[in-house]
Every structure is written in structure tokens, then in C-alpha cells.
From Swiss-Prot:
PANTHER family: 39S RIBOSOMAL PROTEIN L18, MITOCHONDRIAL, LARGE RIBOSOMAL SUBUNIT PROTEIN UL18M
GO cellular component, one term: cytosolic large ribosomal subunit
Protein name: Large ribosomal subunit protein uL18
UniProt xrefs under Gene3D superfamilies: 3.30.420.100
HAMAP family hit by this protein: Ribosomal_uL18_B
Keyword list, A-Z: Ribonucleoprotein, Ribosomal protein, RNA-binding, rRNA-binding
GO biological process annotation, one example: translation
Subunit and interaction comment: Part of the 50S ribosomal subunit; part of the 5S rRNA/L5/L18/L25 subcomplex. Contacts the 5S and 23S rRNAs.
Family recorded in the similarity comment: Belongs to the universal ribosomal protein uL18 family.
Pfam family, one: Ribosomal_L18p
SUPFAM superfamilies the UniProt entry points to: Translational machinery components
Length: 120
């Protein structure tokens, strides 16, 4: 029987999570993409603590875009999460694409975060 798209994403994410782990020195930049919004968190997996977060639902970005499901909105989230991470002294991260393909909104967020100063 054919897998649904959600099942495929979940299987890919579990394979990725076996290899990618955030440490205090190099936390994990985790991305979650829904149909309407995109979310990014910088996570220390050892302490199980979210250090920085940003999404299209943030008060800083809420009214800027007609939809949170665009590459432009993803770029804004990438820049915002990078600025917040750099403000806390986090420069190096490990990228966790959350089982999604590195394309479209995921790629836009990653490139914007890199341009804003995060190293991964």
C-alpha cells in the first residue's frame, strides 16, 4: 500500500533525527512546515530546552504577509530566528529539515538564516 505524504515525512524525519543531535555548543535548528505556516526553533537536545524560536505567527511577522505559506514568509522567519540566535550568542547550528525535502519554503528559510549569520 502506498504511503501518504505525511507518513513519508515522518519516516524521513525519524531517519534524520537518528543522525542529527543538538548540543550546547552546536544546537539544532529544527523546522516544521504546515500548510499555512512555518516554524523554526533552535534546540539544545542535551538539556531538552528550546533556546530560540520564530514562526509566521510571531507578533513581529503576523501582519506582514497575506499567507504564512510563502517563500517570502519563510525567508522572514529564517532572518528572525537567526537574529534571535545571534543575540543569544549562538552562531553555529545543525540544520534539521524535519523530514521535508530541501526545496521551496525549507530552502528559503535555510538560505535566509545563513545570510543573516548562522553557520550550518
Amino acid at each position: 500500500m502506498k504511503r501518504t505524504r505525511t507518513e513519508s515525512v515522518q519516516r524521513r524525519h525519524s531517519r534524520i533525527r537518528r543522525k542529527v543531535e543538538g548540543t550546547p555548543s552546536r544546537p539544532r535548528l529544527a523546522v516544521f512546515r504546515s500548510n499555512n505556516h512555518i516554524y523554526a526553533q533552535v534546540i539544545d537536545d542535551v538539556a531538552q530546552h528550546t533556546l530560540v524560536a520564530a514562526s509566521t505567527l510571531d507578533k513581529d511577522l503576523k501582519g506582514e504577509f497575506s499567507s504564512g505559506a510563502t517563500c517570502e514568509a519563510s525567508e522572514a522567519v529564517g532572518k528572525l530566528v537567526a537574529q534571535r540566535a545571534l543575540a543569544k550568542g549562538i552562531e553555529k547550528v545543525v540544520f534539521d529539515r524535519g523530514g521535508n525535502l530541501y526545496h521551496g519554503r525549507i530552502r528559503a528559510l535555510a538560505q535566509a538564516a545563513r545570510e543573516a549569520g548562522l553557520d550550518f
